[in-house]
Amino acid sequence: MKKILVLGGTGFVGRHLCEKLAEGAYRTTVLTRRRASASHLQMLPMVDVIEGSPYDTAALTPLLAEHDAVVSLVAILHGTEAAFDKTHVQLLLGLVKACDAAGQRRIVHVSALGADLSAPSMYQRSKARGEAVLFNSGLDVSVLRPSVIFGAEDKFLNTFASLQKIFPIIPLAGSTARFQPVWVEDVAAALVKCIADNSTVGKTFEACGPEIFTLKQLVQLAGQYSGNSKPVIGLPDALARIQATLMELAPGEPIMSRDNLDAMKADNIASGQLPGLQALGITPSALSAVVPFYLGAQGLRSGLMAKRKTAGRF
Protein backbone atom coordinates (compact mmCIF):
# COMPACT_ATOMS: atom_id res chain seq x y z
CA MET A 1 0.00 0.00 0.00
CA LYS A 2 1.44 3.35 -1.04
CA LYS A 3 1.67 6.14 1.53
CA ILE A 4 1.11 9.73 0.41
CA LEU A 5 1.94 12.90 2.34
CA VAL A 6 -0.31 15.86 1.51
CA LEU A 7 0.67 19.45 2.30
CA GLY A 8 -2.29 21.83 2.19
CA GLY A 9 -4.71 18.94 2.46
CA THR A 10 -7.34 20.73 4.56
CA GLY A 11 -8.38 23.04 1.72
CA PHE A 12 -10.91 22.73 -1.08
CA VAL A 13 -8.80 20.60 -3.43
CA GLY A 14 -7.15 18.72 -0.56
CA ARG A 15 -10.42 17.36 0.78
CA HIS A 16 -11.38 15.92 -2.60
CA LEU A 17 -7.89 14.54 -3.15
CA CYS A 18 -7.97 12.74 0.20
CA GLU A 19 -11.32 11.20 -0.70
CA LYS A 20 -9.94 9.98 -4.04
CA LEU A 21 -6.83 8.59 -2.39
CA ALA A 22 -8.96 6.71 0.16
CA GLU A 23 -11.03 5.25 -2.68
CA GLY A 24 -7.80 4.12 -4.34
CA ALA A 25 -6.59 2.37 -1.17
CA TYR A 26 -3.75 4.80 -0.52
CA ARG A 27 -2.68 5.57 3.03
CA THR A 28 -2.71 9.36 3.35
CA THR A 29 -1.11 11.68 5.89
CA VAL A 30 -2.25 15.30 6.00
CA LEU A 31 0.07 17.80 7.65
CA THR A 32 -1.75 20.83 9.05
CA ARG A 33 -0.89 23.61 11.46
CA ARG A 34 -4.30 23.26 13.17
CA ARG A 35 -5.58 19.72 13.60
CA ALA A 36 -9.03 21.06 14.52
CA SER A 37 -9.38 22.48 11.00
CA ALA A 38 -9.18 18.96 9.56
CA SER A 39 -12.11 17.33 11.36
CA HIS A 40 -13.76 16.67 7.99
CA LEU A 41 -10.75 14.59 6.95
CA GLN A 42 -10.40 12.59 10.15
CA MET A 43 -13.58 10.69 9.32
CA LEU A 44 -12.14 9.38 6.05
CA PRO A 45 -10.72 5.84 6.01
CA MET A 46 -6.93 5.53 5.81
CA VAL A 47 -6.37 9.26 6.37
CA ASP A 48 -4.17 10.41 9.26
CA VAL A 49 -4.00 14.06 10.30
CA ILE A 50 -0.94 15.33 12.13
CA GLU A 51 -0.13 18.79 13.40
CA GLY A 52 2.90 20.63 12.10
CA SER A 53 4.14 23.32 9.76
CA PRO A 54 5.10 22.68 6.12
CA TYR A 55 7.78 25.36 6.63
CA ASP A 56 9.52 23.29 9.34
CA THR A 57 12.13 21.49 7.25
CA ALA A 58 13.56 19.55 10.20
CA ALA A 59 10.15 18.14 11.14
CA LEU A 60 9.21 17.53 7.51
CA THR A 61 12.26 15.38 6.72
CA PRO A 62 11.37 12.26 8.77
CA LEU A 63 7.77 12.47 7.54
CA LEU A 64 8.90 12.49 3.92
CA ALA A 65 11.10 9.47 4.55
CA GLU A 66 8.04 7.46 5.63
CA HIS A 67 6.03 8.14 2.47
CA ASP A 68 6.17 7.17 -1.19
CA ALA A 69 5.28 10.63 -2.54
CA VAL A 70 4.35 14.13 -1.43
CA VAL A 71 1.58 16.31 -2.88
CA SER A 72 2.06 20.06 -2.58
CA LEU A 73 -1.19 22.05 -2.43
CA VAL A 74 -0.27 24.99 -0.19
CA ALA A 75 -1.23 28.28 -1.86
CA ILE A 76 -2.73 31.71 -1.29
CA LEU A 77 -4.82 33.79 -3.69
CA HIS A 78 -4.30 37.21 -2.11
CA GLY A 79 -1.32 38.91 -0.52
CA THR A 80 1.80 40.97 -0.93
CA GLU A 81 4.82 40.13 -3.08
CA ALA A 82 6.55 38.86 0.06
CA ALA A 83 3.58 36.70 1.08
CA PHE A 84 3.34 35.12 -2.37
CA ASP A 85 7.08 34.46 -2.39
CA LYS A 86 6.99 32.85 1.06
CA THR A 87 4.08 30.55 0.19
CA HIS A 88 4.78 29.68 -3.44
CA VAL A 89 8.59 29.78 -3.56
CA GLN A 90 10.27 29.62 -0.14
CA LEU A 91 8.05 26.77 1.03
CA LEU A 92 9.06 24.73 -2.04
CA LEU A 93 12.74 25.50 -1.48
CA GLY A 94 12.33 24.07 2.02
CA LEU A 95 10.41 21.08 0.67
CA VAL A 96 13.16 20.26 -1.83
CA LYS A 97 15.77 20.52 0.94
CA ALA A 98 13.71 18.18 3.15
CA CYS A 99 13.18 15.73 0.26
CA ASP A 100 16.93 15.61 -0.39
CA ALA A 101 17.61 14.93 3.28
CA ALA A 102 14.91 12.24 3.45
CA GLY A 103 15.75 10.51 0.19
CA GLN A 104 12.28 11.36 -1.10
CA ARG A 105 12.19 11.88 -4.87
CA ARG A 106 8.51 12.09 -5.82
CA ILE A 107 6.62 15.41 -5.75
CA VAL A 108 3.24 16.20 -7.31
CA HIS A 109 2.54 19.93 -7.25
CA VAL A 110 -0.50 22.09 -7.98
CA SER A 111 0.51 25.35 -9.64
CA ALA A 112 -1.84 27.64 -11.59
CA LEU A 113 -2.87 28.19 -15.18
CA GLY A 114 -1.07 31.26 -16.47
CA ALA A 115 2.01 30.73 -14.30
CA ASP A 116 4.79 32.60 -16.09
CA LEU A 117 7.78 34.65 -15.02
CA SER A 118 6.50 37.54 -17.15
CA ALA A 119 2.82 37.18 -16.17
CA PRO A 120 0.91 40.34 -15.20
CA SER A 121 0.18 39.34 -11.59
CA MET A 122 2.34 38.69 -8.54
CA TYR A 123 0.40 35.47 -7.92
CA GLN A 124 1.16 34.00 -11.36
CA ARG A 125 4.82 35.06 -11.31
CA SER A 126 5.34 33.49 -7.88
CA LYS A 127 3.72 30.28 -9.09
CA ALA A 128 6.16 30.20 -12.02
CA ARG A 129 9.12 30.70 -9.68
CA GLY A 130 7.85 27.83 -7.55
CA GLU A 131 7.65 25.56 -10.58
CA ALA A 132 11.23 26.48 -11.46
CA VAL A 133 12.39 25.51 -7.97
CA LEU A 134 10.88 22.06 -8.39
CA PHE A 135 11.98 21.37 -11.95
CA ASN A 136 15.53 22.54 -11.17
CA SER A 137 15.72 20.28 -8.11
CA GLY A 138 16.49 17.08 -9.99
CA LEU A 139 13.58 15.37 -8.22
CA ASP A 140 10.76 13.44 -9.91
CA VAL A 141 8.19 16.20 -10.30
CA SER A 142 4.74 16.36 -11.93
CA VAL A 143 2.90 19.70 -12.09
CA LEU A 144 -0.79 20.44 -12.57
CA ARG A 145 -1.93 23.91 -13.68
CA PRO A 146 -5.69 24.29 -13.10
CA SER A 147 -7.90 27.12 -14.29
CA VAL A 148 -10.46 28.39 -11.77
CA ILE A 149 -11.85 25.39 -9.86
CA PHE A 150 -15.54 24.88 -9.14
CA GLY A 151 -17.37 22.45 -6.88
CA ALA A 152 -19.95 22.24 -4.12
CA GLU A 153 -17.79 24.01 -1.50
CA ASP A 154 -16.08 26.49 -3.84
CA LYS A 155 -15.59 30.13 -2.90
CA PHE A 156 -16.09 31.23 -6.50
CA LEU A 157 -19.53 30.49 -7.92
CA ASN A 158 -21.01 30.13 -4.43
CA THR A 159 -19.80 33.63 -3.57
CA PHE A 160 -21.33 35.18 -6.68
CA ALA A 161 -24.58 33.32 -6.05
CA SER A 162 -24.69 34.64 -2.47
CA LEU A 163 -24.01 38.22 -3.59
CA GLN A 164 -27.01 38.04 -5.90
CA LYS A 165 -29.21 37.18 -2.94
CA ILE A 166 -28.23 40.46 -1.32
CA PHE A 167 -27.68 43.11 -3.99
CA PRO A 168 -30.09 44.33 -6.68
CA ILE A 169 -27.29 44.62 -9.25
CA ILE A 170 -23.75 43.25 -9.45
CA PRO A 171 -21.08 45.74 -10.59
CA LEU A 172 -18.28 43.51 -11.84
CA ALA A 173 -14.58 44.20 -12.31
CA GLY A 174 -12.81 42.15 -14.97
CA SER A 175 -16.11 41.16 -16.56
CA THR A 176 -14.62 40.30 -19.97
CA ALA A 177 -11.80 38.09 -18.65
CA ARG A 178 -12.05 34.53 -19.96
CA PHE A 179 -11.78 31.34 -17.90
CA GLN A 180 -11.96 27.61 -18.55
CA PRO A 181 -13.39 26.33 -15.23
CA VAL A 182 -12.52 22.83 -14.10
CA TRP A 183 -14.42 20.61 -11.66
CA VAL A 184 -12.60 19.88 -8.41
CA GLU A 185 -13.28 16.14 -8.81
CA ASP A 186 -11.43 16.18 -12.13
CA VAL A 187 -8.50 17.99 -10.52
CA ALA A 188 -8.36 15.42 -7.72
CA ALA A 189 -8.53 12.55 -10.22
CA ALA A 190 -5.67 14.13 -12.20
CA LEU A 191 -3.52 14.35 -9.07
CA VAL A 192 -4.11 10.68 -8.26
CA LYS A 193 -3.20 9.78 -11.84
CA CYS A 194 0.04 11.76 -11.54
CA ILE A 195 0.88 9.98 -8.29
CA ALA A 196 0.25 6.56 -9.81
CA ASP A 197 1.85 7.06 -13.23
CA ASN A 198 5.59 7.69 -13.38
CA SER A 199 5.31 8.64 -17.05
CA THR A 200 3.99 12.01 -15.79
CA VAL A 201 7.37 12.85 -14.22
CA GLY A 202 8.93 15.97 -15.70
CA LYS A 203 5.65 17.08 -17.25
CA THR A 204 3.22 19.95 -16.71
CA PHE A 205 -0.49 19.41 -17.34
CA GLU A 206 -3.12 22.10 -17.90
CA ALA A 207 -6.30 21.21 -16.01
CA CYS A 208 -9.20 22.91 -17.76
CA GLY A 209 -12.85 22.19 -18.36
CA PRO A 210 -14.41 21.77 -21.81
CA GLU A 211 -16.01 25.25 -21.91
CA ILE A 212 -14.75 28.84 -21.96
CA PHE A 213 -16.72 31.61 -20.23
CA THR A 214 -16.22 35.28 -19.51
CA LEU A 215 -16.34 36.23 -15.85
CA LYS A 216 -19.63 38.02 -16.52
CA GLN A 217 -21.13 34.85 -17.97
CA LEU A 218 -20.01 32.85 -14.94
CA VAL A 219 -21.58 35.35 -12.53
CA GLN A 220 -24.79 35.28 -14.57
CA LEU A 221 -24.84 31.47 -14.48
CA ALA A 222 -24.31 31.52 -10.70
CA GLY A 223 -27.38 33.74 -10.36
CA GLN A 224 -29.41 31.67 -12.80
CA TYR A 225 -28.62 28.30 -11.19
CA SER A 226 -29.19 29.60 -7.65
CA GLY A 227 -32.51 31.25 -8.52
CA ASN A 228 -31.22 34.71 -7.59
CA SER A 229 -30.38 36.16 -10.99
CA LYS A 230 -29.59 39.90 -10.93
CA PRO A 231 -28.27 42.29 -13.61
CA VAL A 232 -24.47 42.10 -13.94
CA ILE A 233 -22.81 45.35 -15.00
CA GLY A 234 -19.24 45.25 -16.25
CA LEU A 235 -17.05 48.06 -14.90
CA PRO A 236 -14.50 50.05 -16.92
CA ASP A 237 -10.87 49.58 -15.88
CA ALA A 238 -10.62 52.69 -13.67
CA LEU A 239 -13.75 51.83 -11.67
CA ALA A 240 -12.72 48.17 -11.53
CA ARG A 241 -9.46 49.21 -9.91
CA ILE A 242 -11.30 51.30 -7.32
CA GLN A 243 -13.68 48.42 -6.57
CA ALA A 244 -10.79 45.98 -6.07
CA THR A 245 -8.98 48.45 -3.81
CA LEU A 246 -12.08 48.87 -1.62
CA MET A 247 -12.51 45.09 -1.43
CA GLU A 248 -8.95 44.76 -0.18
CA LEU A 249 -9.72 47.22 2.62
CA ALA A 250 -12.80 45.29 3.79
CA PRO A 251 -12.43 42.81 6.69
CA GLY A 252 -11.61 39.22 5.80
CA GLU A 253 -10.37 37.76 2.55
CA PRO A 254 -11.27 39.99 -0.42
CA ILE A 255 -13.60 38.75 -3.14
CA MET A 256 -11.27 40.38 -5.63
CA SER A 257 -7.93 42.17 -5.31
CA ARG A 258 -5.90 44.40 -7.59
CA ASP A 259 -3.56 41.47 -8.20
CA ASN A 260 -6.56 39.39 -9.31
CA LEU A 261 -7.40 42.15 -11.77
CA ASP A 262 -3.84 42.08 -13.05
CA ALA A 263 -4.10 38.32 -13.56
CA MET A 264 -7.24 38.81 -15.63
CA LYS A 265 -5.35 40.90 -18.17
CA ALA A 266 -4.50 37.55 -19.76
CA ASP A 267 -7.11 34.89 -20.54
CA ASN A 268 -7.10 31.98 -18.09
CA ILE A 269 -7.59 29.29 -20.72
CA ALA A 270 -5.58 26.33 -22.02
CA SER A 271 -2.57 27.32 -24.10
CA GLY A 272 -2.82 24.26 -26.30
CA GLN A 273 0.95 23.85 -25.91
CA LEU A 274 0.84 21.51 -22.91
CA PRO A 275 -1.00 18.22 -22.30
CA GLY A 276 -4.41 18.50 -20.68
CA LEU A 277 -6.65 16.27 -18.61
CA GLN A 278 -7.32 14.04 -21.61
CA ALA A 279 -3.63 13.06 -21.60
CA LEU A 280 -4.27 11.67 -18.11
CA GLY A 281 -7.29 9.68 -19.29
CA ILE A 282 -9.78 12.15 -17.81
CA THR A 283 -12.72 13.60 -19.74
CA PRO A 284 -13.39 16.94 -18.03
CA SER A 285 -16.94 17.57 -16.83
CA ALA A 286 -18.95 20.50 -18.15
CA LEU A 287 -19.91 23.20 -15.67
CA SER A 288 -23.56 22.82 -16.69
CA ALA A 289 -23.46 19.14 -15.72
CA VAL A 290 -22.32 19.85 -12.15
CA VAL A 291 -23.14 23.34 -10.88
CA PRO A 292 -26.98 23.14 -11.01
CA PHE A 293 -26.83 20.29 -8.50
CA TYR A 294 -25.24 22.44 -5.79
CA LEU A 295 -26.30 25.98 -6.66
CA GLY A 296 -29.70 24.72 -7.74
CA ALA A 297 -30.43 23.66 -4.17
CA GLN A 298 -30.15 27.33 -3.19
CA GLY A 299 -32.67 28.26 -5.87
CA LEU A 300 -35.05 25.56 -4.69
CA ARG A 301 -34.85 26.80 -1.09
CA SER A 302 -35.41 30.40 -2.21
CA GLY A 303 -38.45 29.40 -4.23
CA LEU A 304 -39.99 27.43 -1.37
CA MET A 305 -39.45 30.32 1.06
CA ALA A 306 -41.10 32.74 -1.39
CA LYS A 307 -44.12 30.45 -1.73
CA ARG A 308 -44.42 30.10 2.05
CA LYS A 309 -44.28 33.88 2.43
CA THR A 310 -46.99 34.34 -0.22
CA ALA A 311 -49.14 31.76 1.53
CA GLY A 312 -48.74 33.58 4.85
CA ARG A 313 -46.73 30.75 6.42
CA PHE A 314 -43.51 32.70 6.98
Predicted regions and their residues:
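Mid/C-terminal beta-alpha module of Rossmann-like enzyme folds, strongest
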Residues: 194-257, 271-314
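Substrate-positioning beta->alpha
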Residues: 155-156, 174-196, 202-206, 217
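Residues forming the Rossmann-fold NAD(P)(H) cofactor-binding site
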Residues: 14-15, 89, 128
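SDR active-site strand-loop-helix element
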Residues: 7, 31, 73-74, 107-113, ...
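NAD(P)H-binding glycine-rich loop region in Rossmannoid oxidoreductase-like domains
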Residues: 36-102, 113-117
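Conserved catalytic-site region of short-chain dehydrogenase/reductase
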Residues: 113-125, 149-154
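Conserved beta-loop-beta element that borders a ligand/cofactor-binding pocket
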Residues: 111, 131-155, 159-162
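N-terminal Rossmann NAD(P)H-binding glycine-rich loop of SDR-like oxidoreductase domains
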Residues: 2-26
